[in-house]
Amino acid sequence: MLISKSIFLVEDDKEDQEFFTECIDDIENATIYGVANNGREALDKLENSTKLPDMIFMDINMPYINGLECLTAIKKNTRLKDIPVVMLSTDTGQAQLSCILGAKAFIKKPADCKLLHAKVEQMINLDFIIDSKIANQSFQFAY
């Protein structure tokens, strides 16, 4: 049996927060670590937390600090850089830039729960099989 992984959701849209939270709650090996409404709030929570999430699902288009800026800050922070980040957006044109900036995967919104479940399970299994530093080298696109 795999150990449950915590997922930090960074999403400004309340309906999307509810959708992703419900989908993640339905995944046997995943729990919600917390929710942030924008990149600034996410960085504050991560930098002030003693226990970090196992992975982050983050929207790109958000106020204050957008998802790409937040991803860049996470990857520059020695304490946070190894947390796998999955970027979420309606704009598939952002997938390549997300990869270049260090995201492990990209999911096109609106997503469906089946796709989200498959991606989370895939990442949990990959992390279980391979050391996370090696696993972070692969990038996956889903839509």
Residue ranges of model-derived segments:
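Conserved acidic carboxylate
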Residues: 11
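Two-component/phosphorelay signaling modules centered on CheY-like receiver
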Residues: 14-35
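Helix N-cap/capping motif at the beta->alpha junctions
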Residues: 35-44, 67
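Short amphipathic alpha-helix used as the core "switch/output" element in two-component signaling
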Residues: 44, 68-81
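Active-site beta3 strand of CheY-like receiver
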Residues: 50-57
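Receiver (REC) domain active-site loop signature in two-component systems and cognate sites
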Residues: 62
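Alpha4 helix (beta4-alpha4-beta5 surface) of REC/receiver domains from two-component response regulators
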Residues: 69, 91-108, 115-118
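C-terminal output helix
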Residues: 111-122, 132
